[in-house]
Amino acid sequence: MSIFRTASTLALATALALAAGPAFSYSINNSRQIVDDSGKVVQLKGVNVFGFETGNHVMHGLWARNWKDMIVQMQGLGFNAVRLPFCPATLRSDTMPASIDYSRNADLQGLTSLQILDKVIAEFNARGMYVLLDHHTPDCAGISELWYTGSYTEAQWLADLRFVANRYKNVPYVLGLDLKNEPHGAATWGTGNAATDWNKAAERGSAAVLAVAPKWLIAVEGITDNPVCSTNGGIFWGGNLQPLACTPLNIPANRLLLAPHVYGPDVFVQSYFNDSNFPNNMPAIWERHFGQFAGTHALLLGEFGGKYGEGDARDKTWQDALVKYLRSKGINQGFYWSWNPNSGDTGGILRDDWTSVRQDKMTLLRTLWGTAGNTTPTPTPTPTPTPTPTPTPTPTPTPGTSTFSTKVIVDNSWNGGYCNRVQVTNTGTASGTWSIAVPVTGTVNNAWNATWSQSGSTLRASGVDFNRTLAAGATAEFGFCAAS
């Protein structure tokens, strides 16, 4: 599209400025793991953060919270990766966002949607959080069956993929692109029909992206029913990879990431959810739809989720069984749907106040990640005791202490106000609960990730649920805006 080829010098400079040193390279090793260019295995503890793919053209929730506040909270909960959906109109240089409370997000005032996308990606990158971009909808409204529609051509799709790849290829923590969200309906695989074969379109899309961003990963989803090489029925959009067994993808194996989607009864009640053997019937279904390829390809779920007990009662059972199955396949990562609470059929990690956390969902995800805590070890036999000399008593060590230092970072300033972030670090030798005071100018009118009060030129702040207690050496962060 011509609008992308006439991007202003300023926009290009902004894109290049996102890079913090040379870009990382991501690939798939022989053990089907994602690794960076140092050979370090990358585990994606991910969540979907949506909004840029909608008519708002910006991440949702900014009517209720500060955007950096949410990113800090994500990271504090243990997420280290996001899948970030977008739509073509968001990429246009003249598209403006909607539904932002600028009193909470003053640094976004006057920015286009693309400029905000740049800032959001740059913030994730600065925090060492991985980003998988996702071409989600062609019209910023509904999910299309194919990669093109009557008003959005394949040529436009390929141009958009190239544009995104070129813009973010040098941002170290952007690891790749999900070529098309949830092919379904008319989409086929391996039939020889060029108009509908998603596998061939994915190969063309991959070639377009890798020609521009050769260090990226390419995420490819499945389809739904297929006339060949597929047992059909009961498949969620993007969830059927069965035809891959008959028609492999001509995409470099060290760049290919299979990323099917799967959901439970909160999204749609498939017949197998009513089976008398549910949920014990599910592993065989998952194995058929996508799991059979976990032994030959890098595979994770690009979307999965649900209300987890606050909708259809079976959904919690389903999600628990899914995580158990994934762990059995050696899959300990993926992108949960969603961070946002305003996903009607799944809810989110956040509740409707855009702040409170579904701790039960986090417990589920930590089980998937393998960070839920150690299980009780199997007892070992008690050995026959042998006499030992009485040891010399050792002095009781002095308990550790916690002390806290602060670092104030200026985020934005303008005539009449400013926004700062404050990093609080436990410089002591034991964990502790932080409460600090920092000098301020003017009147604080908004703060996030802290309980706060102002007395004169002093801002007093203490942690909230997810960041209140810091281990020795750990850092929390909160922010505030003030009228000066």
UniProtKB/Swiss-Prot annotation:
One of its GO terms (biological process) is cellulose catabolic process. Disulfide bonds: none annotated. InterPro entries: CBD2, CBM2/CBM3_carb-bd_dom_sf, CBM2_carb-bd_dom_sf, Glyco_hydro_5, Glyco_hydro_5_CS, Glycoside_hydrolase_SF. Residues 395-484 form the CBM2 domain. Residues 370-402 are annotated as: Disordered. It catalyses: Endohydrolysis of (1->4)-beta-D-glucosidic linkages in cellulose, lichenin and cereal beta-D-glucans. Residues 375-399 are annotated as: Thr-Pro repeats ('hinge') (Pro-Thr box). Pfam families: CBM_2 (PF00553), Cellulase (PF00150). It comes from the Bacteria. PROSITE patterns: CBM2 (PS51173), GLYCOSYL_HYDROL_F5 (PS00659). The active site is at 182 (proton donor), 303 (nucleophile). Residues 1-25 form the signal peptide. One of its GO terms (molecular function) is polysaccharide binding. Keywords: Carbohydrate metabolism, Cellulose degradation, Glycosidase, Hydrolase, Polysaccharide degradation, Repeat, Signal. Residues 378-398 have a biased composition (Pro residues). PANTHER family: ENDOGLUCANASE, MAJOR EXTRACELLULAR ENDOGLUCANASE. The C-terminal region of the protein is not crucial for activity. The Thr/Pro-rich region (also termed 'hinge') may be a potential site for proteolysis. This is Major extracellular endoglucanase. The gene is engXCA.
